[in-house]
């Protein structure tokens, strides 16, 4: 029961403060990875585009 309650609180908190999820800062030790972390959400789109390029290369068989 406490797990469900804590999960509910976490979800409710993320709804109240959605910008804190997107603009969270990395710890100081990992600051060098900031540019990589900024690009990471876009990586799945590259695979999606790669599928179209691949299909175009094989003439959409």
From Swiss-Prot:
Function: One of the components of the core complex of photosystem II (PSII). PSII is a light-driven water:plastoquinone oxidoreductase that uses light energy to abstract electrons from H(2)O, generating O(2) and a proton gradient subsequently used for ATP formation. It consists of a core antenna complex that captures photons, and an electron transfer chain that converts photonic excitation into a charge separation.
SUPFAM superfamilies in the cross-refs: Photosystem II reaction center protein K, PsbK (SSF161037)
Keyword hit for Plastid: yes
Cellular location(s): Plastid, Chloroplast thylakoid membrane
Protein name: Photosystem II reaction center protein K
Known partners and oligomeric status: PSII is composed of 1 copy each of membrane proteins PsbA, PsbB, PsbC, PsbD, PsbE, PsbF, PsbH, PsbI, PsbJ, PsbK, PsbL, PsbM, PsbT, PsbX, PsbY, PsbZ, Psb30/Ycf12, at least 3 peripheral proteins of the oxygen-evolving complex and a large number of cofactors. It forms dimeric complexes. Detected in both etioplasts and green leaves; PSII is only assembled in green leaves.
Pfam families tied to this protein: PsbK
Top-level taxon: Eukaryota
């Amino acid at each position: 029961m406490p797990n469900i309650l804590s999960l509910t609180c976490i979800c409710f908190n993320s709804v109240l403060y959605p910008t804190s999820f997107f603009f969270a800062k990395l710890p100081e030790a990992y600051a060098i990875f900031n540019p990589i972390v900024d690009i990471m959400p876009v990586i799945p789109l590259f695979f999606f585009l790669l599928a179209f390029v691949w299909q175009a290369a094989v003439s959409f068989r």
